[in-house]
Each structure stands twice: as structure tokens, then as C-alpha cells.
Amino acid sequence: MEIWYLGHSSFRIRSRKEIIITDPYGPEIGFKLPKIKADIVTISHEHPNHNRSNLVAGRPFVIHAPGEYEIKNISVFGIPSFHKNTIYLIEAQGIKLCHLGDLDYQLEKETLDKINSPDILFIPIDGCDTIGPKKVIKVIRQIEPKIVIPMHYRNEGLKVKEFLRALDVKATPIPKLIIKKTDLIFEGEKVVVLKRRKK
């Protein structure tokens, strides 16, 4: 599996044959979404910074509501949350990913039980309509992922530094994450910061 960060809350997740794009955004955000195509697009909520599936090529299957979906070899489970937000659990190649969308509150037990310790967690960190760097710690401890990837920030330096400082970890930004299920056999959690892909 290969994961690129496209900026804001958008990621490109490539499994063996399928490509998933999360929360494609419009130019209103201050930078452009790279030219991309996909098989599946997930939209956490209906806002131009998150729902511009029309900018994704390839005639993807667009998911913008809670529910269970099976597309090709990908399993997607959308969980409703506050702020008309959908949390997505995506399973591919035996790896379970959780995209929290615009989460801005602590999770309830029922939701935590559904999320159930994913391998990779995409979590918002900027505190603008979402949880901030300090509240992030509690949410991460609740969810117990193997890998944490921050998202939903515009200044690539400041918010990430606050986030890493709050967690008391160091992480050098990398262009992409390449991972397989056997790479996830370790204790504790790891933070991965991805550089925004501009092309």
C-alpha cells in the first residue's frame, strides 16, 4: 500500500489495483489539488474544502454518507459523527485505515467500539473546526492506532510542530508512506508526517 498526502484532509491511498482519494478540496483552500484519478472517493462532509469529487478523474465511486460499502477489493464503513461528519474505516490488503474527517470532539464509546484500533489513523490537528494538538493526544490514546498521520492543517510547520511537541515525538516529513501488513507488527504507536504532494 502507498499513501500520499495531498493537503488539508486529502490523501491518495493506493492498494494493489485500486486508488482511493479522501476529502478532495477546491482552490478556495489556498492551493490546488494535484491532478489525480481514483476508483473510490470518500467525502467526510459537504464543504468545498472536503467534497470536490468533480476534480477527481476516472469516474470514481463517490461515498458521502454513513453505511457499508464493498467496491472491488476495498471495504469502506462510514460512521456518522457530530458536525454532520462521517468517519471512514477503509480496509485494503489486510490493513485497516481510519479517516476522522472534521472531528471536533471526544469520541463516544459506541463509536470507539466500531473504530476498534485501526492500523493507520488520519487525524485533524489544527483546532479550526476540529480537535487541536492537545486534545489530539486523548483521541489517539482512545483509538490506539499503530500509525498516526496528522492532517487538516495549512501551515506545514507550525501546527505539526505543536502536534509533535504535544506527543513528545520527533518525525521527519517523508514524501510517501509505503507499507504492508507485516510492517505493522510492533508495540506502541508511530507518528508519520507526510509532505504535501503538489503535483
PLM feature spans:
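Conserved beta-strand hairpin/beta-sheet module of binuclear metal-dependent hydrolase folds
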Residues: 1-29, 84-101, 120
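Binuclear metal-ion centers of metallo-dependent hydrolases, dominated by the metallo-beta-lactamase
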Residues: 4-6, 147-199
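Active-site environment of divalent metal-dependent phosphoester hydrolases
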Residues: 12, 27-31, 46-52, 105-108, ...
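Active-site metal-binding loops of divalent metal-dependent hydrolases
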Residues: 24-26, 45-46, 81, 100-104, ...
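Active-site-proximal loop/helix segments of hydrolase catalytic cores
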Residues: 82-143
